[in-house]
């Protein structure tokens, strides 16, 4: 297999890109540890980094600071590298409430989580790709610095089978159970296997469509085929297949026995400390919880919350650095930190928050002290694990400035687009002025982003604009990742014209259709109106030839002045380049992709709304006709075994009858 990166694109590097690519590639080849690409918004930083990846040909980890941006980057890299392994590694929780204890009210909050099966599959796909090939790009969120199992153990437990191999059926079944696969002859899903006579079908943890069918003749593997799990259609013959463990926290039996013995020793030591301190309730609680976990581990090889025992399972010393996704990469991997001014501070802050919560659990007998070693990396540990890094940002932070005094600048856009014109208008009458601007944009079939300071203001403004007939949506922190990507897609498609947000419209949100960004209360100094935030927000209008920004402010703050001056400086450089090369600015033409399957497939997208009009507006005869129609639809749906739709229609029917 060809293990080189192959960039597939209709474009070649333009403007500042060739120079930036050459500088970064030379830096990597010369062994530079840190480099920063200071790239203005819309200058094609992703395309530049793709060219760098192709040139240096190293396995690459691309870190983003949230799932939305990671999803967007995953889509882009997938298109640019269709022949290579582009993987996605983010937290697999749609919802996550870590276990916690509140001493003041004596409240223990059990861990509660909703795991996104699709993202779990992609995480397994990412780690297995790293062991199978070198042409791998993994797009990850900051969750990649959280503890995973030992990569050596994971690699050693890979089940390698080939045709002609001597192995009886029961040995294969035992080995599958050892690597956390469940036997399920009825519900055949990822991470399970089923048995039919001399045929074993295995559904790898990293797949969701194809399974492996292994056929035995006596004690020999006669045939291996790749099969569509749903239809049973044979997709191809395989002479060799590697089955990777179904859990990243997988341990061999002898190691598990050793780990259990070590946990028992730690438990006894901790119980004696708690009893000496007369913390009898805590001691009893700890003993009960830990003994239950030990029993599960001895019988099943697994328990709920097994990650809290990861130090023992990997036989590490107390306080030792945990294994993370970074350990699954070869030593010479390349790290690219996107929007580094936000991502690096996130990495820095992860350890302390996690530690504070776990210390309370340990002190009150909910966990053993070794649970403190199931943690994210400290920033110094993260630095040690990274060989070479490229930080990418339009507004580099203090860390980048300190480590890369000479930055690689990328200011010219391949499309000739200029940084937007920034205008300052008074706060008085800002909403009326904004409405006038919105109507102008809608007339030109262009979109508007509005950024406010508070959630309440965003909600009130959204309601007010809706009342006067403007198609508007509000993007807030409670909107799920998957929904957020869909909202941005709907804005691009023109389903609505105005998107309002607080801090969600800054880094990396790529919407070429937006030609106006309105910043309300721009003169209120603070995190949301700091110079970096303002430059990033201004950048949202830099992908459209008519891009402009209106700041509503009564005074010119230092942050506003810096942001406006930097925008002017870049605009002058861009204008001079365009005049010299006879370039006319053109809005970026960017395909509107389907929402990335990596983050969306686990969501149910079927629309089960009844086709009735609002019952409030119906007369008596119309209501009766609607009731009959909905009832007929409901019965038809039930006949077709479409029970979700039938249930939805039943609820509508009850409403209609209640109002009658």
Curated annotation (Swiss-Prot):
A motif (Beta-hairpin) lies at residues 92-115. Residues 26-413 form the Helicase ATP-binding domain. ATP binds at residues 39-46. InterPro entries: Helicase/UvrB_N (IPR006935), Helicase_ATP-bd (IPR014001), Helicase_C-like (IPR001650), P-loop_NTPase (IPR027417), UVR_dom (IPR001943), UVR_dom_sf (IPR036876), UvrB (IPR004807), UvrB_inter (IPR041471). One of its GO terms (cellular component) is cytoplasm. Its main location: cytoplasm. One of its GO terms (molecular function) is excinuclease ABC activity. It holds the Pfam family ResIII. Disulfide bonds: none annotated. Residues 624-659 form the UVR domain. The keyword DNA damage applies. Keywords: ATP-binding, Cytoplasm, DNA damage, DNA excision, DNA repair, Excision nuclease, Nucleotide-binding, SOS response. It comes from the Bacteria. Belongs to the UvrB family. Forms a heterotetramer with UvrA during the search for lesions. Interacts with UvrC in an incision complex. The beta-hairpin motif is involved in DNA binding. This is UvrABC system protein B. The lineage of its organism: Bacteria, Bacillati, Bacillota, Bacilli, Bacillales.
């Amino acid at each position: 297999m060809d293990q080189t990166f192959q960039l597939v694109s209709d474009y070649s590097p333009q403007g500042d890109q060739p120079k930036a690519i050459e500088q970064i590639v030379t830096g990597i080849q010369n062994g530079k540890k840190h480099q920063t690409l200071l790239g203005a918004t819309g200058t094609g930083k992703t395309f530049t980094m793709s060219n760098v990846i192709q040139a240096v040909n190293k396995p690459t980890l691309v870190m983003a600071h949230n799932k939305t941006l990671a999803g967007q980057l995953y889509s882009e890299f997938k298109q640019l590298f269709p022949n290579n392994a582009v993987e996605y590694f983010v937290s697999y929780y749609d919802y996550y409430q870590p276990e916690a204890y509140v001493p003041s009210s004596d409240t223990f909050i059990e861990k509660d989580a909703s795991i996104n099966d699709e993202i779990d599959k992609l995480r397994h796909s990412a780690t297995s790709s790293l062991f199978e090939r070198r042409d791998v790009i993994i797009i990850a969120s900051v969750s990649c610095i959280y503890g995973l199992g030992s990569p050596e153990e994971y690699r050693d437990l890979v089940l390698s089978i080939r045709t002609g191999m001597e192995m009886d059926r029961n040995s294969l079944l035992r080995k599958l159970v050892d690597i956390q696969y469940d036997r399920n002859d009825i519900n055949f899903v990822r991470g399970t296997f089923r048995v039919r006579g001399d045929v074993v079908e295995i559904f790898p943890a990293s797949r969701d469509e194809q399974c492996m069918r292994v056929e035995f003749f006596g004690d020999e593997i006669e045939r291996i085929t790749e099969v569509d799990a749903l239809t049973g259609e044979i997709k191809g013959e395989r002479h060799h297949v590697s089955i990777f463990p179904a859990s990243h926290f997988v341990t061999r039996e002898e190691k598990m026995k050793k780990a259990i013995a070590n946990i028992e020793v730690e438990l006894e030591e901790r119980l004696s400390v708690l009893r000496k301190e007369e913390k009898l309730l805590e001691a009893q609680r700890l003993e009960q919880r830990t003994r239950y976990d030990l029993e599960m581990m001895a019988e099943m090889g697994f328990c709920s919350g097994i990650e809290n025992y990861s130090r023992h399972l990997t036989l590490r010393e107390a306080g030792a650095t945990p294994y993370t996704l970074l350990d699954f990469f070869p030593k010479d991997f390349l790290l690219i930190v996107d929007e580094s001014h936000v991502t690096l501070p996130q990495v820095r802050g992860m350890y302390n928050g996690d530690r504070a919560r776990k210390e309370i659990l340990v002190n009150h007998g909910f966990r053993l002290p070794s649970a403190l070693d199931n943690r994210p990396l400290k920033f110094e540990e993260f630095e040690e694990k990274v060989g070479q890094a490229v930080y990418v940002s339009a507004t580099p932070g203090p860390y980048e400035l300190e480590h890369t005094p000479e930055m690689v600048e990328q200011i010219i856009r391949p499309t000739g687009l200029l940084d937007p014109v920034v205008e300052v208008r008074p706060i008085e009458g800002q909403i009326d002025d904004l409405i006038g601007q919105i109507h102008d944009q809608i007339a030109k079939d262009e979109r508007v982003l509005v950024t406010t300071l508070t959630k309440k203001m965003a909600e009130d403004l959204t309601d007010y604009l809706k009342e006067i007939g403007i198609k508007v949506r509000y993007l807030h922190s409670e909107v799920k990742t998957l929904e957020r990507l869909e909202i941005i897609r709907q804005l691009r498609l023109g389903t609505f014209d105005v998107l309002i947000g607080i801090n969600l419209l800054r880094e990396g949100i790529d919407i070429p259709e937006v030609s106006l960004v309105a910043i309300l209360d721009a003169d209120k100094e603070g995190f949301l109106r700091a110079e970096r935030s303002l430059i990033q927000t201004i950048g949202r209008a830099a992908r459209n030839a008519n891009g402009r920004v209106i700041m509503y402010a009564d005074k010119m703050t230092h942050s506003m002045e810096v942001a406006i001056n930097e925008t002017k400086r870049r605009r002058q450089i861009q204008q001079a380049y365009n005049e010299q090369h006879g370039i006319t600015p053109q809005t970026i033409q960017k395909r509107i992709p389907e929402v990335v399957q990596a983050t969306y497939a686990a969501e149910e997208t079927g629309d089960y709304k009844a086709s009735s009009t609002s019952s409030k507006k119906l007369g008596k005869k119309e209501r009766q006709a609607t009731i009959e129609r909905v009832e007929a639809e409901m019965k038809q749906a039930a006949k077709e075994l479409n029970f979700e739709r039938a249930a939805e229609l039943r609820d509508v029917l009850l409403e209609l009858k209640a109002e009658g």
